[in-house]
């Protein structure tokens, strides 16, 4: 099963088996107005049931993150690697400080902002 690349409040990951069992075998256009982490979308997509998808959420930062992952995956991965190196290299005592510094940061690039969203 495909899993979302981030955690999101109100996520539907636990409901995926039930929703997939009740979903039609073919969905011409899947519309998700509250995508969150996208657990349902990813499960349906990997099952091959979706022909076209329209994803939305009221959280602009979240939607920008989805666009960056779709359109600039290499940039997002590079930015995440920098965050991971700083966080994991800091040691357990300093990781809280790193987390709060990342949370307070304002990355200059779209990929950097997407990486921050995923990291947090």
Predicted regions and their residues:
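Class I S-adenosyl-L-methionine-dependent methyltransferase module
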Residues: 42, 46-120
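S-adenosyl-L-methionine
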Residues: 1-35, 39-43, 48
């Amino acid at each position: 099963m495909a899993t979302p690349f981030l955690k999101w409040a109100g996520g539907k990951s636990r409901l995926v088996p039930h929703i997939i069992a009740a979903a039609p075998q073919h969905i011409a256009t899947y519309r998700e107005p509250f995508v969150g982490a996208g657990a349902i979308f990813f499960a349906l997509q990997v099952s091959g049931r979706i022909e076209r998808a329209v994803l939305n959420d009221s959280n602009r930062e979240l939607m920008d993150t989805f666009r960056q992952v779709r359109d600039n995956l290499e940039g997002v991965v590079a930015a995440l690697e920098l965050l991971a190196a700083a966080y994991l290299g800091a040691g357990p005592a300093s990781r809280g400080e790193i987390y709060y510094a990342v949370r307070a940061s304002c990355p200059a690039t779209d990929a950097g902002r997407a990486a921050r969203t995923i990291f947090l």
